[in-house]
């Protein structure tokens, strides 16, 4: 649907008030606009009243029936914000809705993974059907077909909800209750129903605990989870979350956006303002978190004296102050229809409310939130590679819930880090093969958290003079989740909550790194700095680097270029993917497959097997810049001296990887180990030729940290060249991580003066790299390569972009210290010299 059309539907524009251009996009057809109104309203589960669909579709009941059918067919969450309509009007409870969904997918013999994540979690909560239970039910369903008396899927599903968690502050509403229903109720149940009908909605904590559960299981009541403007929400490590698939419907998208943005010091109204999302939608999402048990309220007053005696021994995360009249938390669309508490009006235009919150209650919540002395935090940015390591390694029994939280919520807040650190401490440092990689990342992550979190020495000069310095709290943020927000919203979220961003290194090439001027970012300044372009930039400014060839998408090789003759191993980087080392003997087919859908960087890596790499941490100490070049003092390498003069390494942190292609130290099988980077596949399954070949990863045994093996043999400066430069804190090596953290502290990188210099240097570096990249985009459409028989090429005709980083429009070669355009022959005489860096 057209974005402009959606905007005008969302803001209830009738056809007569639509701008001319919007009408033209609809073919000047009012009927088409009305169709779009109905479709948008159903997809977004909008209430019939007070929305444009009321003027388009006259039958309210039919509209809700269509909405329910669409939601069920698309496996969406039950529309709890429409519970008054769904339960009282259509007699569809959440239990019957999910039982119908489960019946549908069983009859279609779909896998459990077809259920979206949140829908699967709600099914598990109400039906008690998870992955294993579903497989068992499907086996029973299939086996029953072999016998005369066949059982349907419905026969195998539960007849009533499982025991669910109900909080005392939830509101009990009367459902669709007939006289026949009353007859089967016990005396206490009848009393509770009479109280709800006569006195209005009741806090569940004011009723008998067992009666509430009994009435809910019978479908006679439904539960609202009220969220007010001042509600503050905490998200603990996820329990009961089902990792299936992401569907992408409006509410699921909203849930993930709020997940990564929410914190327990920001109330719902402030959060809606930061995200620029309608307040009622944010309340619906937060209410869903609480209902599913993924979040709980903060800052509420517990008054046990007002609770029904049956609730006294019931464990509860939180309880609303029960002296608050639940009727005051409800809103009404008109004089006679009660509105769900989670649908409070979000603007002053909703004048049909029957009450406002008690000012005293609002004040008590506000004072609690203000008295916490909340300060901004440090954010440590990681990617999904880290969460994969924590989940796959089977490192600790309770570590997985934290890893799932880091992946699904996109954030692990400082309040959860104590329990996370306890689980990381349980990880043993012993492992073999690939498992060792998981152990190393877990242990190094723990050290990084301990270093950044509440480190008073780290930020000694950034604290306010009138406040004691305890350092800053730390949140862990997943880059991919932040990128789910639009750039402006992401910037507002980061500015509101954080004083400094620190990235892990290296971030996978498969994501676009977060760019930020404020708060300052110790990490890649712009996406191009974390791309293939930056490698070429480093080689260009230093005049040193391995033989490299960047081929544009669509290029086809007939033979391996001459600059790679004699190399036993090549480092291959497919655009938007992480690099891998492959044998030169059988690389041609894989290269051509990859080039059909991606630009590719080819680099010489090893003459005698895999080349040897050494990681040199920066910023450099004065002692590291003096003396003669040795393996233990690579900081005096000429290339690094030039690099320091062109790139400010004193206010950044990270490491430079040096490569010795002629070393025979690392001549061992590729399969024995793995690289510090994550994804193993270069040629993905989306390859147009259907190739399933993949590039194996750089072996980690070939990588060492500076001074790890200081006496492992003589080495010449000319043997070593820079391979790459990564900004951030590395997690793949504990020794390298320790050195980088130590340098951050000793050089005061997190102090105010250093961060100001960092901001200036980041902008300068960004401009230089962007100019460098831009110089290869001009004239791309007119470039004509005349390949000799050894090479043929089909170039991209425009400098298109992948994930925001421009693709190369020219084939480029780096050889003998010179970056030049490659025409398919021997090195071109046409050098790229007009670079003003």
Curated annotation (Swiss-Prot):
Keywords in alphabetical order: Cytoplasmic vesicle, Golgi apparatus, Phosphoprotein
Family according to the record: Belongs to the FAM91 family.
Principal location: Golgi
Region (Disordered), start-end ranges: 334-366, 670-691
Compositional bias of kind Polar residues: 340-366
Assembly mode: Component of the complex WDR11 composed of C17orf75, FAM91A1 and WDR11; FAM91A1 and WDR11 are required for proper location of the complex. Interacts with golgins GOLGA1 and GOLGA4 and with TBC1D23; interaction with golgins may be mediated by TBC1D23 and interaction with TBC1D23 recruits TBC1D23 to AP-1-derived vesicles.
A single BP term in Gene Ontology: vesicle tethering to Golgi
Compositional bias (Basic and acidic residues): 670-680
GO CC annotations on file: cytoplasmic vesicle; trans-Golgi network
Sites bearing Phosphoserine, chain numbering: 332, 340, 671, 828, 834
Protein's recorded name: Protein FAM91A1
Pfam families (UniProt xref): FAM91_C, FAM91_N
């Amino acid at each position: 649907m057209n974005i402009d059309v959606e905007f005008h539907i969302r803001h209830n524009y009738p056809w007569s008030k639509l701008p001319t251009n919007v009408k033209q996009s609809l073919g000047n057809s009012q009927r088409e606009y009305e169709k779009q109104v109905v479709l948008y309203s159903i997809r977004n589960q909008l209430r019939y009243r007070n929305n444009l669909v009321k003027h388009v579709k006259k039958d309210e009941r039919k509209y809700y029936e269509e909405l329910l059918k669409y939601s069920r067919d698309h496996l969406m969450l039950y529309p709890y914000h429409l519970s008054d309509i769904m339960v009282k009007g259509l007699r569809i409870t959440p239990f019957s809705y999910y039982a119908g969904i489960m019946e549908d997918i069983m009859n279609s013999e779909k896998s459990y993974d077809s259920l979206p994540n949140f829908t699967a979690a709600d099914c598990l909560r109400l039906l008690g059907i998870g992955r294993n239970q579903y497989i068992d039910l499907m086996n029973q369903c299939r086996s029953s077909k072999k016998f005369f008396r066949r059982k349907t899927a419905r026969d195998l599903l539960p007849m009533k909800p499982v025991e669910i968690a109900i909080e005392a502050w939830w509101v009990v509403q009367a459902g669709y209750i007939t006289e026949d229903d009353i007859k089967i109720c016990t005396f206490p149940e009848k009393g509770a129903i009479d109280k709800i009908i006569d006195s209005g909605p009741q806090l569940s904590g004011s009723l008998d605990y067992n009666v509430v559960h009994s009435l809910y299981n019978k479908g006679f009541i439904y539960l609202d989870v009220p969220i007010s403007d001042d509600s503050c929400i905490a998200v603990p490590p996820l329990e009961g979350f089902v990792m299936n698939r992401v569907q992408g419907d409006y509410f699921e998208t909203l849930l993930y956006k709020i997940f990564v943005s929410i914190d327990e010091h920001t109330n719902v109204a402030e959060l809606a303002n930061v995200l620029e999302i309608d307040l009622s939608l944010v309340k619906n999402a937060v209410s869903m978190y609480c209902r599913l048990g993924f979040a709980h309220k903060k800052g509420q007053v517990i008054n046990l004296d007002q609770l029904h005696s049956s609730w006294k021994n019931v464990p509860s995360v939180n309880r609303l102050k029960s002296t608050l009249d639940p009727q005051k938390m409800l809103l009404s669309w008109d004089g006679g229809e009660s509105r769900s508490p989670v649908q409070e009006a979000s603007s002053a235009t909703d004048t049909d409310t029957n009450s406002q919150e008690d000012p005293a209650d609002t004040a008590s919540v506000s004072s609690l939130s203000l008295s916490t002395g909340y300060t901004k935090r440090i954010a440590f940015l990681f990617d999904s590679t880290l969460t994969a390591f924590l989940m796959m390694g089977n490192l600790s029994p309770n570590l997985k819930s934290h890893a799932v939280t880091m992946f699904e919520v996109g954030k692990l807040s400082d309040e959860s880090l104590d329990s996370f650190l306890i689980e990381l401490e349980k990880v043993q440092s012993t492992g073999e093969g690939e498992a060792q990689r998981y152990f190393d990342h877990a242990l190094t992550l723990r050290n990084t958290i301990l270093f950044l979190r509440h480190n008073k020495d780290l930020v000694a000069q950034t604290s306010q003079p009138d406040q004691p310095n305890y350092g800053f709290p730390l949140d862990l943020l997943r880059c991919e989740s932040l990128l789910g927000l639009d750039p402006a919203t992401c910037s507002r979220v980061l500015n509101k909550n954080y004083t400094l961003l620190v990235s892990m290194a290296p971030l996978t090439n498969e994501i676009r790194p977060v760019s930020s001027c404020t708060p300052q970012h110790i990490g890649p300044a712009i996406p191009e700095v974390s791309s293939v372009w930056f490698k070429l930039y480093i080689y260009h400014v230093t005049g040193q680097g391995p033989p490299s060839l960047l081929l544009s998408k669509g290029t086809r090789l007939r033979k391996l270029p001459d600059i790679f003759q004699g190399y036993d191993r090549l480092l291959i980087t497919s655009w938007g993917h992480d690099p891998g080392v492959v044998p030169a003997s059988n690389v041609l087919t894989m290269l051509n497959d990859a080039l059909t859908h991606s630009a590719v960087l080819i680099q010489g890596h090893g003459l005698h097997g895999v080349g040897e790499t050494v990681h040199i941490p920066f910023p450099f100490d004065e002692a590291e810049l003096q003396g003669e070049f040795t393996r233990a003092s690579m900081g005096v390498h000429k290339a690094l001296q030039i690099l320091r003069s062109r790139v400010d390494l004193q206010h950044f942190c990270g490491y430079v990887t040096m490569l010795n292609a002629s070393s025979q130290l690392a001549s061992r099988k590729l399969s024995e180990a793995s690289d510090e980077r994550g994804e193993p596949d270069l040629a993905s399954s989306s390859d147009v030729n259907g190739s399933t070949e993949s590039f194996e990863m750089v072996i980690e045994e070939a990588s060492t940290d500076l001074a790890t093996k200081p006496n492992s043999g003589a080495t010449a400066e000319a043997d070593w060249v820079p391979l790459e430069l990564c900004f951030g804190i590395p997690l793949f090596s504990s020794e390298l991580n320790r050195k980088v953290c130590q340098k951050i502290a000793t050089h005061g990188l997190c102090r105010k003066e250093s961060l100001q210099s960092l901001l200036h240097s980041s902008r300068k570096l960004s401009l230089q790299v962007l100019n460098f990249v831009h110089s290869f985009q001009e004239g791309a459409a007119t470039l004509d390569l005349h390949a000799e028989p050894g090479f043929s090429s089909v170039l991209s005709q425009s400098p298109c972009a992948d994930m925001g980083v421009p693709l190369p429009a020219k084939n480029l070669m780096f050889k003998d210290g010179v970056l030049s355009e490659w025409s398919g022959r021997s090195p071109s005489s046409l050098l790229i010299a007009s670079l003003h860096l």
